[in-house]
Amino acid sequence: QSNNLKNSLSLFFTYFKNKYNLQTSTYSIFGFSAGSQFAHRYLLFSDDIQVDRVVLGSAGWYTFLNNEPYPYGMRNMPIERERYEWYLSREVLFILGAKDNDPNHESLNNSKGAKQQGSNRFERGQNYFKNLVIFSEENEIAFRWRYKVIDDLDHSTSAISENAFPFLLEGLDY
């Protein structure tokens, strides 16, 4: 991984912060579907510590904290305990749609590694969150993520967004 890709969001944040003289030292991320796939891996593998809050919604597949080969797991990945601690201690809202359960959705990764995570986005998300809970307990790492399932939701950016904004804006004076 090049440092530019590895810390790409941090570079954009710093550029805009300087260009517009912004007075904040942190930023938030909203990732849905493929954006969620990128965002959770960015948090896990970058050196960026400026990320404050993150919403992860309905990724098609994940990098589990287990011994499966990368990109489905962490086998042979150069990551230190401190990064796991940082990753699991972020303020993350993990949102799934209970009806995002189409195993044949046109944009769903149906590779062998992805199918081992579950047959659809909802199952894969449930399994990923369980993996994080187990990993944090086994390694005695604080886990701050929030988990939300929206009962009548399939694969919809707008519905995820409506649930994400209160979390992203929480505590802001606007």
Sequence positions of predicted segments:
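Short beta-strand immediately N-terminal to the catalytic nucleophile in serine-hydrolase-like folds
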Residues: S28-G31, G57
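Alpha/beta-hydrolase active-site loop
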Residues: Q1-N21, Y27
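The feature captures the conserved acid-bearing segment of alpha/beta-hydrolase catalytic domains
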Residues: D52-V55, A59-I134
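Phosphate/oxyanion-binding active-site loops and adjacent basic polyanion-contact surfaces
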Residues: Q1-L9, R121-G125, T157-I160
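C-terminal catalytic histidine-bearing segment of alpha/beta-hydrolase fold enzymes
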Residues: Q126-Y174
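Short glycine-enriched nucleophile-adjacent loop
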Residues: S36-D47, A164
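Extracellular/periplasmic catalytic domains that process cell-envelope and extracellular macromolecules
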Residues: L22-Q23, D47-I49, Y84-S89, E140-I141
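Solvent-exposed, polar/charged alpha-helical surfaces in well-ordered, non-transmembrane soluble domains
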Residues: N7-T14, H40, Q126, K130
